[in-house]
């Protein structure tokens, strides 16, 4: 195999794709800062329409719906990934669904002018649909165009796009920027601008060569794209690997979601994929970010919004750190380090919140624990679950697997946002002990069940699961995953 380079064409394609990740992060974080102002908008709009102010229960319910409907849209969108990518391809799917982003952005941006709470909620639902689809499209596209030796590092860029989006939303949401009573619709409608930018750039990005060769049998086109993306003429080994996978696919019917659980060779990787997605959301990270302002306020911080932005900066910095570590330390190792560190910090958060009234220094301990908690999250549980799903499956079952994994992520995200306030109300500082328990459980699962995929081709990983499944079938019981014992594919030389 020839020497692979990180070419401008590859960087351009991945950067354009991660605009979708940015959109996910931005629309996740954008609703938090203007909470009070949007509640006032809902109150005034309903009062003007009904000649009487709404009840506190109705006001709170409509606000909660405005927040939660985003995750509902995400669940539906993530489960629909396969409908798009198998028919239109990876790149074209990203281009088509940008219509949803424009529509959702317009509804949110114009809701105040139209004096319509319904437009706000509908806009959040539509933008959720869009972001749910992006959580499947982006890591799949990046994984399929990246060289094997750099697949993990480039896969981390998906998470970097998300955290940069969250950080930008936090900064733009400051009252003196766009988080004011007059400008908050622009804050929500801003999502249209990156949509236009991505739509203009996507036609200059190539389609996934794996999709072209395996799904559409366009070998010559796929070969030319690989040569341009990887900066080498010798891509024969990669083309042969795709052709072998294509031959295997031609002997199988299209893989459905139900077959992921019925077929023994798919069952273990889909369970691993779901549990890794749960490890991201049930780690407590979104509870920290959703309610970080309140947590910092409880810890005694005078300007909690700036502390929240500080956590967002830490989030971004350590995602970049993970980018350089993932191909050296491996996915499995980093995921375990991240989970273990978060479990320790979660316990420390509980202790510091319990003691902050008795000891002045405990407020700073709590803030430090939150920042380190966020850092450990971005070392492993943040980026790894998104791209490792694409690595565990071959071309046939990959879209269905991405849909199931993405839906698991969005569903658990929704449940945390829904249940955390009640849990925090009844448990107080002890609420983070729940997340500590989850983190320890996920750490044990990762140690015993999750394979290392660093340096292995998609075909190599798939064969390992098939071998394990056949062994389990012969013995009549579930086999223990032995992928970690297989030698990685011979690493290619990659010039940066």
Curated annotation (Swiss-Prot):
<dbReference type="GO" id="GO:0005886">
    <property type="term" value="C:plasma membrane"/>
</dbReference>
<dbReference type="GO" id="GO:0015757">
    <property type="term" value="P:galactose transmembrane transport"/>
</dbReference>
<protein>
    <recommendedName>
        <fullName>Solute carrier family 2, facilitated glucose transporter member 3</fullName>
    </recommendedName>
</protein>
<feature type="transmembrane region" description="Helical; Name=1">
    <location>
        <begin position="11"/>
        <end position="32"/>
    </location>
</feature>
<dbReference type="InterPro" id="IPR036259">
    <property type="entry name" value="MFS_trans_sf"/>
</dbReference>
<dbReference type="GO" id="GO:0016020">
    <property type="term" value="C:membrane"/>
</dbReference>
<keyword id="KW-0325">Glycoprotein</keyword>
<feature type="transmembrane region" description="Helical; Name=7">
    <location>
        <begin position="270"/>
        <end position="290"/>
    </location>
</feature>
<dbReference type="GO" id="GO:0005354">
    <property type="term" value="F:galactose transmembrane transporter activity"/>
</dbReference>
<keyword id="KW-1133">Transmembrane helix</keyword>
<feature type="topological domain" description="Extracellular">
    <location>
        <begin position="112"/>
        <end position="118"/>
    </location>
</feature>
<keyword id="KW-0812">Transmembrane</keyword>
<feature type="transmembrane region" description="Helical; Name=6">
    <location>
        <begin position="184"/>
        <end position="204"/>
    </location>
</feature>
<dbReference type="GO" id="GO:0042995">
    <property type="term" value="C:cell projection"/>
</dbReference>
<dbReference type="GO" id="GO:0055056">
    <property type="term" value="F:D-glucose transmembrane transporter activity"/>
</dbReference>
<dbReference type="InterPro" id="IPR020846">
    <property type="entry name" value="MFS_dom"/>
</dbReference>
<dbReference type="GO" id="GO:1904659">
    <property type="term" value="P:D-glucose transmembrane transport"/>
</dbReference>
<keyword id="KW-0966">Cell projection</keyword>
<feature type="binding site">
    <location>
        <position position="386"/>
    </location>
    <ligand>
        <name>D-glucose</name>
    </ligand>
</feature>
<comment type="subunit">
    <text>Interacts with SMIM43; the interaction may promote SLC2A3-mediated glucose transport to meet the energy needs of mesendoderm differentiation.</text>
</comment>
<feature type="binding site">
    <location>
        <position position="315"/>
    </location>
    <ligand>
        <name>D-glucose</name>
    </ligand>
</feature>
<keyword id="KW-0762">Sugar transport</keyword>
<dbReference type="GO" id="GO:0046323">
    <property type="term" value="P:D-glucose import"/>
</dbReference>
<feature type="topological domain" description="Cytoplasmic">
    <location>
        <begin position="143"/>
        <end position="153"/>
    </location>
</feature>
<feature type="modified residue" description="Phosphothreonine">
    <location>
        <position position="492"/>
    </location>
</feature>
<keyword id="KW-0472">Membrane</keyword>
<dbReference type="InterPro" id="IPR045263">
    <property type="entry name" value="GLUT"/>
</dbReference>
<feature type="topological domain" description="Extracellular">
    <location>
        <begin position="421"/>
        <end position="429"/>
    </location>
</feature>
<feature type="topological domain" description="Extracellular">
    <location>
        <begin position="353"/>
        <end position="363"/>
    </location>
</feature>
<feature type="binding site">
    <location>
        <position position="159"/>
    </location>
    <ligand>
        <name>D-glucose</name>
    </ligand>
</feature>
<dbReference type="GO" id="GO:0005536">
    <property type="term" value="F:D-glucose binding"/>
</dbReference>
<feature type="topological domain" description="Cytoplasmic">
    <location>
        <begin position="86"/>
        <end position="90"/>
    </location>
</feature>
<feature type="region of interest" description="Important for selectivity against fructose">
    <location>
        <begin position="277"/>
        <end position="279"/>
    </location>
</feature>
<feature type="topological domain" description="Cytoplasmic">
    <location>
        <begin position="326"/>
        <end position="331"/>
    </location>
</feature>
<dbReference type="InterPro" id="IPR002945">
    <property type="entry name" value="Glc_transpt_3"/>
</dbReference>
<dbReference type="GO" id="GO:0043204">
    <property type="term" value="C:perikaryon"/>
</dbReference>
<dbReference type="GO" id="GO:0070837">
    <property type="term" value="P:dehydroascorbic acid transport"/>
</dbReference>
<feature type="topological domain" description="Cytoplasmic">
    <location>
        <begin position="205"/>
        <end position="269"/>
    </location>
</feature>
<feature type="binding site">
    <location>
        <position position="286"/>
    </location>
    <ligand>
        <name>D-glucose</name>
    </ligand>
</feature>
<dbReference type="InterPro" id="IPR005828">
    <property type="entry name" value="MFS_sugar_transport-like"/>
</dbReference>
<feature type="transmembrane region" description="Helical; Name=2">
    <location>
        <begin position="65"/>
        <end position="85"/>
    </location>
</feature>
<keyword id="KW-1003">Cell membrane</keyword>
């Amino acid at each position: 195999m020839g020497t692979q380079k990180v070419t401008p064409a590859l960087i351009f394609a991945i950067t354009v794709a991660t605009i979708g990740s940015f959109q996910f992060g931005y629309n996740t974080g954008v609703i938090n800062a203007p909470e009070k102002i949007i509640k006032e908008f809902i109150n005034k709009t309903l009062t003007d329409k009904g000649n009487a102010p709404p009840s506190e229960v109705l006001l709170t319910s409509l606000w909660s719906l405005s927040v939660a409907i985003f995750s509902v849209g995400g669940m539906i969108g993530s489960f629909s990934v396969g409908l798009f990518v198998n028919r239109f391809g990876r790149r074209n799917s990203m281009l088509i669904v940008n219509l949803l982003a424009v529509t959702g952005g317009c509804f949110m941006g114009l809701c105040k002018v139209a004096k319509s709470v319904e437009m706000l909620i509908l806009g959040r639902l539509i933008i959720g649909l869009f972001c749910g689809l992006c959580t499947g499209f982006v890591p799949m596209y990046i994984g399929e165009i990246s060289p094997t030796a750099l697949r993990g590092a480039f896969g981390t860029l998906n998470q970097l796009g998300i955290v940069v989006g969250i950080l930008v939303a936090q900064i733009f949401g400051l009252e003196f920027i766009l988080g004011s009573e007059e400008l908050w619709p622009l804050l929500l409608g801003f999502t249209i601008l990156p949509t236009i930018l991505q739509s203009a750039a996507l036609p200059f990005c190539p389609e996934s060569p794996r999709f072209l060769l395996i799904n559409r049998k366009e070998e010559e086109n796929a070969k030319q794209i690989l040569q341009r993306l990887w900066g080498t003429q010798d891509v024969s080994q990669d083309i042969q690997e795709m052709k072998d996978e294509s031959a295997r696919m031609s002997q199988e019917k299209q893989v459905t979601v139900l077959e992921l659980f019925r077929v023994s060779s798919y069952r273990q990787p889909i369970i691993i994929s779901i549990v890794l997605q749960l490890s991201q959301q049930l780690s407590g990270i979104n509870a920290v970010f959703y309610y970080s302002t309140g947590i910092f306020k409880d810890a005694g911080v005078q300007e909690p919004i700036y502390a929240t932005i500080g956590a967002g900066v830490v989030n971004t910095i350590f995602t970049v750190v993970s980018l350089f570590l993932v191909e050296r330390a491996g996915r499995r190792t980093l995921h375990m380090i991240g989970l273990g560190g978060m479990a320790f910090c979660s316990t420390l958060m509980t202790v510091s919140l319990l003691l902050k009234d008795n000891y002045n220094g405990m407020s700073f301990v709590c803030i430090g624990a939150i920042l380190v908690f966020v850092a450990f999250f971005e070392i492993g549980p943040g980026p790894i679950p998104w791209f490792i799903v694409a690595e565990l499956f071959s071309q046939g079952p990959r879209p269905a697997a991405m849909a199931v994994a993405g839906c698991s992520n969005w569903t658990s995200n929704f449940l945390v946002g829904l249940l955390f306030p009640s849990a925090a109300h009844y448990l107080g500082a002890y609420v983070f002990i729940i997340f500590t328990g989850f983190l320890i459980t996920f750490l044990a699962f990762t140690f015993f069940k999750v394979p290392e995929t660093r340096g292995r081709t998609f075909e190599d990983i798939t064969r390992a699961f098939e071998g394990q499944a056949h062994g389990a079938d012969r013995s009549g019981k579930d086999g223990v995953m032995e992928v970690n014992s297989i030698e990685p594919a011979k690493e290619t030389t990659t010039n940066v």
